[in-house]
Amino acid sequence: AWQFAELQMTAQANGWAKFVSMQNHYNLVYREEEREMNPYCLSTGVDLTPWSPLARGILAGSYQGGFGGGSTDRSKGQDRQRTEGLYHGDHVFPIAERVIEIAAKYEKTPAQIAVAWLLHKPGVASPVVGVSKVSQLEQLVAAVEIQIADEDVSYLEELYRPVDNLLSIGFS
């Protein structure tokens, strides 16, 4: 966050246009941005446009039971290795299972619940989603209308564990 703040100050000092949005990595299983970047952006009026809101399919239910349980061509193919490098930790699949549980409660898809959670967070303007079908995009757009109860938000969030070593994560 300090580097982004430095860029903002440099832009201001030189009369340049400042950044108005931050495209950061943020979802239910990767919430490191809550430490510094999100609060900085919120306090300075910079909108968040998080990428990977579905954690490369994990939060959409594509890997039920673990990485070996891939249910899509992408989750069974070479992308699986990238996903494993980016999302690891004992909290990942239990959180994904809670997303599935809450989705059933609201009669929505897990992907819709993951995006609705993100849209519930302060400062999030719009997540950057990736889809392979028009129907998936339509479902995710419909997530704008979903209101998740505070107790369900807490239930989704309570298993998260911060990453001990940020250098240990992979790249998307």
Model-found features: residue ranges?
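Terminal-tail/helix-coil boundary detector
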Residues: 31, 43, 67-105, 120-124, ...
